[in-house]
Amino acid sequence: MSFWKVAAAQYEPRKTSLTEQVAHHLEFVRAAARQQCQLLVFPSLSLLGCDYSRRALPAPPDLSLLDPLCYAATTWRMTIIAGLPVEYNDRFIRGIAVFAPWRKTPGIYHQSHGACLGRRSRTITVVDEQPQGMDMDPTCSLFTTGQCLGEPDLLASARRLQFFSHQYSIAVLMANARGNSALWDEYGRLIVRADRGSLLLVGQRSSQGWQGDIIPLR
């Protein structure tokens, strides 16, 4: 089985400019690169600082301002999934930007329930709010989701994700800004869960299965 190392970025919501948010993302990218990660997932609306206080989301950012993340994905041979507003059905909703080594511009998707991808596949499958296993690309082996939840919503979400991983036999990586980011394997077993604070939750897949680690960032 091929080696695969993935990570979830976790940090408290922060209100700064888009330029500063991108710079903050790059700090996590460099930390993930030092761990030789091939995938890095950020929390929901990470490019807005994971800020849910606004009643209505702003328009999507100018994609040229995200060029540093495109360059980082190419430089470090890493797929990066960040959260941002997207236009969908004539309104602005939560979405994701996927920066990949093989892309010159980010792929933009509505976030919905999350996204599935595989170790060697270049396909990103966005999963609907009520996911069905048959809708997933068979090459997908990891489901990723970015969130910004506190209790009690976080506990309910974690239970759903654990059930999802077991039901559809797929590993699940959750990046949650407010703590308790986690990784479950394809059997629904919890591999690693973070506490609170600024950190990388790292998962490694090998012939022995999934293993996890927590890397604090200061």
From Swiss-Prot:
Transmembrane segments: none annotated. Signal peptide: none annotated. Gene3D superfamilies: Carbon-nitrogen hydrolase (3.60.110.10). InterPro entries: C-N_Hydrolase, C-N_Hydrolase_sf. Residues 4-207 form the CN hydrolase domain. It comes from the Bacteria. This is Uncharacterized protein YobB. It comes from Escherichia coli (strain K12). The lineage of its organism: Bacteria, Pseudomonadati, Pseudomonadota, Gammaproteobacteria, Enterobacterales. The gene is yobB.
